[in-house]
Design a protein with these regions (language model features):
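Intrinsically disordered, low-complexity peptide-like regions
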Residues: 35-37, 87, 140, 169
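N-lobe entry segment of adenylate-forming
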Residues: 1-64, 68-81
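Residue-level preference for short coil/turn positions at secondary-structure junctions
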Residues: 46-48, 87, 135, 153
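Conserved AMP-binding/adenylate-forming core of the ANL superfamily
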Residues: 48-106, 123-128, 173-175
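Adenylate-forming
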Residues: 40-43, 69, 73, 91, ...
Length: 175
């Protein structure tokens, strides 16, 4: 049987679609599946292939490779582990799409934590409501939103600006 991704016509894919065959597309299985591995790590082949293109509001474009995201996510996962974050803990992040956003998202997943992305336009009340609901161990945000985030009780706030990567450079680039 061919893999679903081998069909080039929609009609063929529809005809041969089978939910059981979808598992053939993943490295993991029903018992062990890590979304960070499936989305990023298995595509990091040291060839610099583009994973994400970000169009910023100021007109600048940013390109992130699978290799960059994989290495940074692994370092961040190690940092989370050394910081006492356990599988199942929640990590909230209120960031625009950027390298820190993707490192937070996939690094938390790689660690086995639950990634909780938050809308960047939340004010104090909206943010408090979400944080009180999900009880994250960490809230990662930018300097602009740090003042709001630091008013919340019971959550450690990490500022993900240009120095964000300085938290994680000493850690291994695989997890």
């Amino acid at each position: 049987m061919s893999k679903l991704t081998e069909y080039t016509r929609y009609a063929d894919a529809q005809q041969h679609a089978d939910s059981r065959a979808l598992w053939d597309l993943f490295d993991g299985d029903r018992e062990r599946l890590n979304i960070a591995h499936e989305c990023i790590l298995r595509h990091a082949t040291s060839d610099g292939r583009t994973a994400v293109r970000i169009a910023h509001a100021d007109g600048a474009d940013e390109t992130l490779s699978f290799d960059t995201i994989a290495a940074g996510s692994a370092r961040f996962a190690h940092w989370l582990e050394q910081s006492g974050i356990e599988p199942g803990d929640r990590i909230a992040f209120m960031l625009e799409p950027s390298l820190p956003f993707y490192l937070s998202l996939f690094g938390a997943m790689l660690r086995g934590a639950i990634s909780v992305p938050l809308f960047t336009l939340f004010g104090l009340d909206g943010l408090r409501l979400r944080v009180d609901d999900c009880k994250p161990k960490l809230l990662i945000t930018n300097r602009e939103k740090a003042g709001i985030a630091e008013q919340l009780e019971g959550v450690r706030v990490i500022i993900a600006d240009a120095g964000f990567e300085n938290l994680i450079p000493k850690h291994l680039v695989y997890y």
